[in-house]
Amino acid sequence: MGILSITDQPPLVQAIFSRDVEEVRSLLSQKENINVLDQERRTPLHAAAYVGDVPILQLLLMSGANVNAKDTLWLTPLHRAAASRNEKVLGLLLAHSADVNARDKLWQTPLHVAAANRATKCAEALAPLLSSLNVADRSGRSALHHAVHSGHLETVNLLLNKGASLNVCDKKERQPLHWAAFLGHLEVLKLLVARGADLGCKDRKGYGLLHTAAASGQIEVVKYLLRMGAEIDEPNAFGNTALHIACYLGQDAVAIELVNAGANVNQPNDKGFTPLHVAAVSTNGALCLELLVNNGADVNYQSKEGKSPLHMAAIHGRFTRSQILIQNGSEIDCADKFGNTPLHVAARYGHELLISTLMTNGADTARRGIHDMFPLHLAVLFGFSDCCRKLLSSGQLYSIVSSLSNEHVLSAGFDINTPDNLGRTCLHAAASGGNVECLNLLLSSGADLRRRDKFGRTPLHYAAANGSYQCAVTLVTAGAGVNEADCKGCSPLHYAAASDTYRRAEPHTPSSHDAEEDEPLKESRRKEAFFCLEFLLDNGADPSLRDRQGYTAVHYAAAYGNRQNLELLLEMSFNCLEDVESTIPVSPLHLAAYNGHCEALKTLAETLVNLDVRDHKGRTALFLATERGSTECVEVLTAHGASALIKERKRKWTPLHAAAASGHTDSLHLLIDSGERADITDVMDAYGQTPLMLAIMNGHVDCVHLLLEKGSTADAADLRGRTALHRGAVTGCEDCLAALLDHDAFVLCRDFKGRTPIHLASACGHTAVLRTLLQAALSTDPLDAGVDYSGYSPMHWASYTGHEDCLELLLEHSPFSYLEGNPFTPLHCAVINNQDSTTEMLLGALGAKIVNSRDAKGRTPLHAAAFADNVSGLRMLLQHQAEVNATDHTGRTALMTAAENGQTAAVEFLLYRGKADLTVLDENKNTALHLACSKGHEKCALMILAETQDLGLINATNSALQMPLHIAARNGLASVVQALLSHGATVLAVDEEGHTPALACAPNKDVADCLALILSTMKPFPPKDAVSPFSFSLLKNCSIAAAKTVGGCGALPHGASCPYSQERPGAIGLDGCYSE
């Protein structure tokens, strides 16, 4: 918002600023637009409110000026009046219904503005009209916050008298007290405290009043707070006390006051830093550091990372502070948890003067730090030659003459070739750092240029990886081998070819926010890397050398997109064509395409004759570029004749399939426009899928439109007969579906199971898609039955999957379709899959028409619900008059179905709520009790027994003359046998094999016969013909005891699952599998 010229304003505004009432009246009589807007949407009324001329304002208001007009900042004339502190203008605006709750873009009301601008009279006029004085602006501040911020005692007092809350917090949980303390408004602070404000309040980050006052150096506020009993060592959320804050910001006067008041000079924060650490590192903390040292601060206190105050001073090279610390006993060689001493830190950040001080005071230059590095490692790694020289001059043992110059260099008192824990010497670090002066100093001091690290790399490998031309020249001139391979088989040439990737970042170079400023530096580095590669090639580096994976330098240059490096390698290599075309392990063309390096790819494409070489998976470079979505690479390859129809080996996808599946529309467009084949859009993969099908499966609408516009066949089917429309129905993409229908896709196409897209949309619950398909189907073939090859309709599928919206739509569309197709009705489908919502909808819509319907085997929905143990389904069916004792073609009721399948909940419901008949017999004369026992379902059998005392039911025999006791005994159901015996089951009844229930326990017929012979010899009872009615009655009454005797006999096994007699057709368990 700039300053506008008054001459550019409308005449009415000019007259207002001139305070010319008559001119204003004249302009208004001439029908001048009273609500005319300037560039910032301010009206003449805004101007009048700002100027504060009451007569003009009154004239404008009487002439119909908009009293609540808002400018671009949403400020109203009332805001302007409050800002100008003109209570008369404000009162006039209020009298003309100005909105007292109007908010600007910062959500500030006129009261906020009045409080911020010390407009006490305006605030007094506004306060009674507001429901609350604590309304917050966008930052959460109330009018009291603004009044305190302005430091106007009268306004603060007024707001408090009118009921403003003392402890209201902004979005950072700062109270008005925080602002009074921070800005040094002592009288305001005292007033707030006198009114009951909490001196111990903290904001969201735990800053108290003492912290805020210390931060801004408000010494008088600090003294007042200390007098009022403020906790002097109270930490904030980061563990910092007020003394930490004062030392960090260089507020030495506050620090003195705090120390004199007894602040703990050694209290650590959450990271273990004391105020002395903070003073040592801060910009303006020199006086604070001296104060702390003189008041007993521990100069050797270590943080959680082991850093002492001397470490902190070394980071920024605080020379004077370091001297003070050393003079007061700071340990010179104190190591942090990484092993770094202050000398390591000073070397890392290039503070030569501090290094001199530390060395003068006995710092150990041979001390190992991070990764077992010397300080010299760090100095040369980060390119500080002066520090390197200083460290080399320490502990002089002998003097040698440099081979490169006549300069005498003093050798260090440690072995310069000592490696770190990764085997890297100082020369490796210098080569990586790229400072040739450091490199020369080390070489002249006897550094071994052939020394290898643990990865087998020489210093030349590191120089090449960082593209350092001067270092490479120095090392090669000194005798470094240009073709030496590391553990991966890589020569320096491999790393030089990819030097932009391996180049070490420059941590001491500040990063620029402007990419244009970085570009010259990047270009300079690219040139240097190119010169480095060129130098290596000129000095015997072999471009045909392969690493252990089979990659040459050409592969590396292609993989990392260094076009100039690649061109140079191709030019210098005698067998470059063989390297480029080799696909073992992967060709350079594939590497460039995969990584999206179009410039490198273009270079290779211009060199190669065949661009359709394939990798071990059968993928071409064009396939990889398309799959990765690199449009520029696709454009390069297609322009040079790469084929879009070559298929990879696994799924037989072409680049078109890859583009469509990934949604790369631009790449797909380029592939189609290559014009390789007229039907290129209909090429199929191993499963018969076209690119159109894959685009729809993945919801890529743009690709779908493009393929259809380019002639893709909408009705093409895969090997299972499924078209793009089938896939659209499954994914539910309405836009894709609409595009297909616009291109005349056949809506009633069927797959290999006879299912149409309508079936799939119903099964997947896509209501909008289903509606569209049903409308299209009406116009295609309104008489189509709409059932698949198994006789199932879309209504069956919607019911089975529980999509009630789809079912509702289908019922509206064709209410009698439930009669079509498979007699296993939609209601059967809903209850067998526990879909309560669709069950309820079908019963509500069709009721008696469907509730007792039967499938091909005579089973009702009640049978299906019982089979699935669907109690809620059973309840709803019975509420709609389902026949509880209805039998299927085998004579079984729903209860018998539940009992046979062990569905305990269903059995319980049908017995207790449904009152199902237990005496119903199936075609083999089995009761529900027989069936429960035959499948070993103890709980179901016991439930049935708990509901009956009928001896006829308990001793009922099926067509094989077996009682429930025979079957329970055969299956080892001890608890059921006991219950049967307690209910009076006879133990002497024989089945058609002549076996009693006791003999039914035998594992097979032969064992049963043997057991019968033994028992007959033992003769525990009178012969059969001699048994009197009395003795039979006695046996019956003693059946429990008899059962216990048999059960306790170890000779008779329990739980045997094999029947002792051959199963007869139609005996127990027939049709036991309830499947459709």
Curated annotation (Swiss-Prot):
Q: Where are the ANK repeats?
A: 7-36, 40-69, 73-102, 106-135, 139-168, 172-201, 205-234, 238-267, 271-301, 305-334, 338-367, 371-400, 422-451, 455-484, 488-545, 549-579, 584-613, 617-646, 651-680, 687-716, 720-749, 753-782, 790-819, 822-852, 857-886, 890-920, 924-953, 960-989
Q: Where are the transmembrane segments?
A: none
**Residues that bear Phosphoserine:** S1028, S1075
Q: Which SUPFAM superfamilies match?
A: Ankyrin repeat
Q: Where is the composition biased (Basic and acidic residues)?
A: 502-514
Keyword annotations from UniProtKB, A to Z:
ANK repeat, Phosphoprotein, Repeat
Query: Mind telling me which PANTHER family this protein's record contains?
Result: ANKYRIN REPEAT DOMAIN-CONTAINING PROTEIN 65, ROLLING PEBBLES, ISOFORM B
Quaternary arrangement and interactors, per the entry? Protein phosphatase 6 (PP6) holoenzyme is proposed to be a heterotrimeric complex formed by the catalytic subunit, a SAPS domain-containing subunit (PP6R) and an ankyrin repeat-domain containing regulatory subunit (ARS). Interacts with PPP6R1.
The protein, known as: Serine/threonine-protein phosphatase 6 regulatory ankyrin repeat subunit C
Tell me what gene encodes this. Answer: ANKRD52
